[in-house]
Every structure is written in C-alpha cells, then in structure tokens.
Amino acid sequence: MRRIFPSFMAVLVGFIAFWLLLFIASNVAAAIVRPTPGTMTQAYTVSNLAAYALAAAGAGWMTAWRAPRERMRHVGALAFILALLAMAGMRNPVSGQPDWFPQALVALGPLGALLGGYLGSRRQAPGAPPAA
C-alpha cells in the first residue's frame, strides 16, 4: 500500500493543479476579453480553450514532477481522468457554447497534460548524475 501512495499523490497533485490553474487562467482570460454575460464570443471561446490547454499542460508537468518513477505513466493516468471529465461535460453542454467546444476540451485536456508531462519528465531527477 505504501508504494501506491506516492503515485496516487502525484496524480492527485496534478489534478488539483489543473483546477487551480484553470481557475486562474480562465479568470485572467475573462478579465482581458471581458465577455458579455450569457454569450461566448469568438475571443472568449479561444481564450477559454487556451486557458484549458495551459492548465492541462501545467497539471501534466506537476504530475511528472511529483511522480516517483515512470513519470509518463502517471501523466497518462491524469490525461485519462481529464478526458473522462471532459466527456462527462459533453452530456450537459453549456448554452451559448459552439457545438464543437466540448469535443475540443476532450482533445485539449489529455494532449495538454501529455505535453506538459513530457516537458516535466525531461528534467533531471534530484541526485542524478549530470547527463553527458
């Protein structure tokens, strides 16, 4: 059981990081774009997609950073969770969103997490000898 805990925590930290980063990025995007309540302009839609992708990439990086070993497997677990959440969101689309918006989130979440995880997994592990 003790061997599972660090892996579980790595994915949990990434998941929490995703929501925190998404909250921050979407609020910054809303402050910049200043959407009209109840509508999704093209600029607001693009800023939401960018915020989602950046949050997923940051979460993937955090998961890889916290993973005790096999970092990309942990990131893959996070990407799977993000895909499931986005698919669940497809069942109840928000009014005013383009029809393709939920499908874009299904793709952007896992891809962003995998990209961020790849970048995070390339870092040198603490205590490892320098690469030649």
Model-predicted segments: where are they?
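Juxtamembrane/disordered regions of integral membrane proteins
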Residues: M1-A132
